[in-house]
Regions:
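HhH-family (HhH-GPD) DNA N-glycosylase catalytic core used in base-excision repair
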Residues: 1-208
Length: 208
């Protein structure tokens, strides 16, 4: 059974009785709380974008308040630790899932949807997943490969120095090396078989 088979396709007419759907760390009660909380948010604001515009003066303030809102409302509907996991604290952590969502919504190119028109790409901070952290650590941008807010700011500052108008532009390209090719962002035996080695700045010009 799919998500839409279970809950329906209309956020205002949900079928939430007896759901057994779960996702990774989210138990059925967490999934149910997530759907109900989003439905309530749509009823109050009309869209997630409108909620952001109402919840803060800028996208960062809105993100912080959005997380507080979703955590509080979700807890009232039975959401547990799995639910809270979806809404990482953007003040203390990189909050990669939330920032990936913002990248999709705000940036507009062949990779990202860009359906939110009230924010600019220059407002976005970077997304620090495992691959970006490995790249940044091996490149000397950060001192440890941990997903902290401090490291998020340092990585964003690095890419913003390259492109102040769109610092998150490089996330897809850099992380894709790790996702698709297993890149370690440094000289490694994998470089010997990588099809991108000749154009890669991290390979150290490995000869195959």
């Amino acid at each position: 059974m799919s998500f839409f088979d279970e809950f329906g396709t209309d956020p205002f007419k949900l079928n939430c009785t007896g759901t057994k759907l779960y996702y990774r760390f989210q138990k059925p009660a967490d999934v149910r709380a997530f759907v109900l909380t989003l439905s309530e948010l749509y009823g109050e604001y009309g869209s997630i974008e409108n909620a952001f515009l109402e919840l803060g003066e800028n996208i960062e303030e809105s993100l912080v308040n959005f997380v507080v809102h979703m955590r509080e409302k979700g807890a009232e509907k039975g959401g547990g630790e799995g639910y809270r996991f979806l809404f990482a604290d953007p003040v203390k952590s990189g909050a990669k899932r939330l920032r990936m969502f913002l990248r999709w919504m705000v940036r507009s190119d062949d990779v990202d949807f860009g359906i939110w028109k009230k924010y600019s790409a220059e407002d976005l901070l970077f997304i620090i997943d495992t691959h970006i952290l490995r790249f940044a650590y091996k490149s000397g941008i950060i001192q440890s490969p941990s997903g902290t807010r401090k490291n998020l700011d340092k990585v964003t500052e690095f890419f913003r120095s390259m492109n102040p108008d769109d610092p998150a532009k490089y996330d897809f390209a850099v992380s894709r090396l790790g996702i698709a090719f297993g890149c370690t962002y440094g000289e490694h035996e994998k470089c010997l078989t990588c099809e991108e080695v000749e154009n890669c700045p991290f390979s150290g010009n490995v000869n195959r």
